[in-house]
Every structure is written in C-alpha cells, then in structure tokens.
Curated annotation (Swiss-Prot):
Part of the 50S ribosomal subunit. It holds the Pfam family Ribosomal_L6. This is Large ribosomal subunit protein uL6. It comes from Polynucleobacter necessarius subsp. necessarius (strain STIR1). The keyword Membrane does not apply. GO terms for molecular function: rRNA binding; structural constituent of ribosome.
Length: 177
C-alpha cells in the first residue's frame, strides 16, 4: 500500500459521503461529485474519517490505493472549498470578458474567441487581463484553464500570450548578427 493511500481523509462538516459498492458520491455546499473506484480498492467510513482498503494483495491494488485516496480527497475539498486557477493575459490588446456561461477572449486574432464553459465551472474577470476559473472538480478546472491557455500560449521571445499567474516564462535571446 502506498504512503498516500495509508493516510486517512477527514471529512469536514457540510460534506456528505455515500458509498455504494465501487461508486462514491460526495455532496457539499458547492455541488455533488461522483466517482467509480478501481475494483482492487474500496473505502471504509468511520466517525467522519475515510480510509482506503485493499480488496486484494496484488501490486496493482497497492498502486491504486494512493490514486483512489487522492481522487476522493480532491472530491471532498472540491465540494467544500472548491478549486480555482488564475490566468493572466500579457500582450497589447489582449482582453478577456466573462459573460454568463461563456468567456470572450481577444487574443490578437482577426476574430474574438468565444469559449463555452462546461457545467460546474465558472469564470470571473476582475480586470481585462485576468481570468479566474473556479469549480468543484479539480480535473475540470485544470482542463478549462489549459484549453484557454492553449489558444495563445506564451511565446518564448517577448512572453506574450495567456499564462498561469504562477508560471515562469523563460525568454530566449534574439538572434545576433
């Protein structure tokens, strides 16, 4: 069993967990998330603490225990506090505007990019060059942030483009004669 899989998950107040065989459902103030666990692992719930249990002694079960624990912990954190990813737009004329379920991006193309946000993910634009993507599903929030960044990823000479706030763009030196 992995080190991550051995550590228990404390369930905060406001989160309800229901285990139905390999299917786990987590409900909280920010929504509901479901996940099917791998057949080699299971979950045991006692006094607001979840622990991962191995169903067999195969090496695969040991490897899956850490994965299952991390996924379930992300679900619990997601429905209670949520996840967010911050993006910044660097470049002249680069703008973003959140309009309901869509995100309008002006990234130097001849046309505006309209990105439709999936269910469960919200976008905010505190300024024209900042985007905050929020949601309860960590994977979905990261996927949306990566797709928005992919429209105009930072170029290596001036650093213009869409980047994560904590991202460091290493700039290349221009060609000398």
């Amino acid at each position: 069993m992995s080190r991550v899989g051995k550590s228990p998950i404390t369930v905060p107040k406001g989160a309800e967990i229901s285990i139905n065989g390999a299917n786990i459902t987590v409900k909280g103030p920010l929504g509901t998330l479901t996940h099917n666990l791998h057949p080699s692992v299971g979950l045991k719930q006692e006094d607001g603490v979840l622990t991962v249990v191995l169903n067999n002694d195969s090496p695969e079960a040991g490897a899956q225990s850490g994965t299952a624990r991390a996924l379930v912990n992300n679900m619990v954190v997601g429905v209670t506090t949520g996840f967010e990813r911050k993006l910044s737009l660097v470049g002249v004329g680069y703008r973003a505007a959140a309009q309901g379920e869509t995100l309008k991006l002006q990234l130097g193309f001849s046309h505006d990019i309209i990105y439709n946000l999936p269910k469960g993910v919200k976008a905010e634009t505190p300024s024209q060059t900042e985007i905050i993507i929020k949601g309860s599903n960590k994977q979905q929030v990261g996927q949306v942030a990566a797709e928005v960044r992919a429209y105009r990823s930072p170029e290596p000479y001036k650093g213009k483009g869409v980047r994560y706030v904590d991202e460091v763009v290493h700039l290349k030196e221009t060609k000398k004669k």
